[in-house]
From Swiss-Prot:
Annotated organism of origin: Rattus norvegicus
Protein family per UniProt: Belongs to the SPE39 family.
Keyword presence, Secreted: no
Protein location: Cytoplasm; Cytoplasmic vesicle; Early endosome; Recycling endosome
Protein name per Swiss-Prot or TrEMBL: Spermatogenesis-defective protein 39 homolog
InterPro entries: Spe-39 (IPR040057)
Cellular component terms per the entry's GO annotation: cytoplasm; early endosome; endosome; Golgi apparatus; late endosome; recycling endosome; vesicle tethering complex
Covalent S-S links between cysteines: none
Length: 460
């Protein structure tokens, strides 16, 4: 196609393509201007992670992992180079705090922390020489937020001052057990906080490992023992308690664990036998008084009450015998009498109550004795609706006169009050009590006879 000279000039002047030139400096300057426009058209390279559509290659054609690496300085010392850097300063707030590198090196090498051919200090060296706040270019956050191992443990020391439990929770979640235990061993306040926290959340496994590391044998044993509370099956709980017998408890605690194991073992036997008797309907006590609950996992006193209620007359050789339980678990006389009295009085078995307090001396004489005091006996009998004759018998056995009169008046044991006033020769008190009994009753007649007697020398 033939073109005139004017057409050619118009083509070259209007085309976006530049004519070829042998002037290296002019060509380099045009490259630098193109580079500046390309940089200005991009977003701030600190936020370049969102620009997934951009081709991540360097200007030399080398693929890189970040756009921040793709910014390359060109060789040259023209004024336009300084102008490009000034615009970059405006776009990156941290740029002013970095040392200015010589123009013979690229920014990509700077951010990678290594040099191009030649000598250039690394990124860590450059940052160490900078007194101002430093940044992590990849994250755009101050490096001071990232702490090393020793600084992390300076946080745990604040627990002593500020009681910041969240620090301990964070360390528990992020550190291995060995490191956590070793560091807490020299921080007793933080250690106590962690132990309390583990107990609250029920992390028995970590708590046992901690006590084992600290060589706290008794606390280790107690923590292991507490796990039986989470076992519902009686047989499995019994087997678990058996494993606790040999743990390094104190002598007193070891005896308690042994007793608990023995008690549960007996409860399992008693429960199986009584369930069979109750379902068969052949035993009168179970027909009249059906069981309201299972005996399994009940305390010792409850088990004794159960035995006194359902198995009171059994021989000592059986596991369910109250006497057997008393001897096996060394139950004191006071506790045994109090429990047996409550059980037999509830059944209104007054003969058993009488036999419970009757003792014989070596000459064969009988005497009533109550380790709990007869005033307690009277209160329990009245609570279980004992007849007045039974109440009067035991009120008379109270030794203290004032207590006897108060109990007799409270529970309307008229004969006891009248006889006591007569023995005290207290005419005024007897007259006052006469107004409290029914008119025309036998008690009123008895009081009149005593008041009219000439053989009594009244003190008032």
């Amino acid at each position: 196609m033939n073109r005139t000279k004017g057409d050619e000039e118009e083509y070259w002047n209007s085309s976006k393509f530049k004519a070829f030139t042998f002037d290296d400096e002019d060509d380099e300057l045009s490259q630098l201007k193109e580079s500046k426009r390309a940089v200005n058209s991009l977003r701030d390279f600190v936020d370049d992670d969102d620009d997934d559509d951009l081709e991540r290659v360097s200007w030399t054609g080398e693929p890189v992992g970040s756009i921040s690496w793709s910014i390359k300085e060109t060789a040259g010392s023209s004024g336009s180079t300084s102008e490009g850097r000034e615009q970059m300063k405006g776009r990156n707030s941290f740029y002013t705090q970095l040392p200015k590198p010589p123009s013979t090196y690229s920014l990509s090498s700077f951010f990678r922390g290594r040099t191009r051919p030649g000598s250039f200090q690394s990124l860590s060296d450059a940052l160490s020489d900078t007194p101002a706040k430093t940044y992590s270019p990849e994250l755009g956050r101050p490096k001071g937020e990232y702490r090393d191992y020793s600084n992390d443990w300076s946080l745990s020391d604040t627990v002593r001052r500020l009681r910041q439990g969240k620090v301990l929770i964070f360390l528990k979640r992020t550190l291995s057990k060995e490191i956590l235990f070793r560091e807490l061993e020299v921080r007793q306040v933080a250690l106590r906080h962690l132990i309390h926290f583990l107990k609250e959340i029920g992390d028995q496994k970590l708590l046992l490992d901690l006590f084992r590391f600290l060589d706290r044998t008794e606390e280790l044993a107690l923590s292991h023992y507490r796990e039986h509370l989470n076992i519902q099956d009686p047989e499995k709980r019994k087997e678990f308690l058996k494993t606790c017998i040999g743990l390094p408890f104190s002598a007193e605690d070891s005896a308690h664990v042994q007793d608990q194991y023995t008690l549960l073992e007996r409860q399992i036997i008693i429960e199986a036998n009584d369930r069979h008797l109750e379902s068969s309907g052949q035993t009168e006590i179970f027909r009249k008084h059906p069981r309201k609950a299972s005996i399994l996992n009940m305390p010792l006193v409850t088990t004794l009450f159960y035995a006194c209620f359902y198995h009171y007359t059994e021989s000592e050789g059986t596991f369910s015998s109250p006497v057997n339980l008393k001897k096996t678990f060394k139950i004191p006389d006071r506790q045994y009498v109090l429990t047996a009295l409550a059980a037999r009085a509830k059944l209104r078995a007054w003969n058993d109550v009488d036999a419970l307090f009757t003792t014989k001396n070596w000459l064969g004489y009988t005497k009533k004795r109550a380790p709990i005091g007869f005033h307690r006996v009277v209160e329990i009998l009245h609570k279980n609706s004992a007849p007045v004759q039974i109440l009067q018998e035991y009120v008379n056995l109270v030794e203290d006169v004032d207590t006897k009169l108060n109990l007799a008046t409270k529970f309307k044991c008229h004969d006891v009050v009248i006889d006591t006033c007569r023995d005290l020769k207290d005419r005024q008190q007897l007259l006052a009590y006469r107004s409290k009994v029914d008119k025309g009753s036998a008690e009123e007649e008895k009081i009149d006879v005593i008041l009219s007697s000439s053989q009594i020398r009244w003190k008032n």
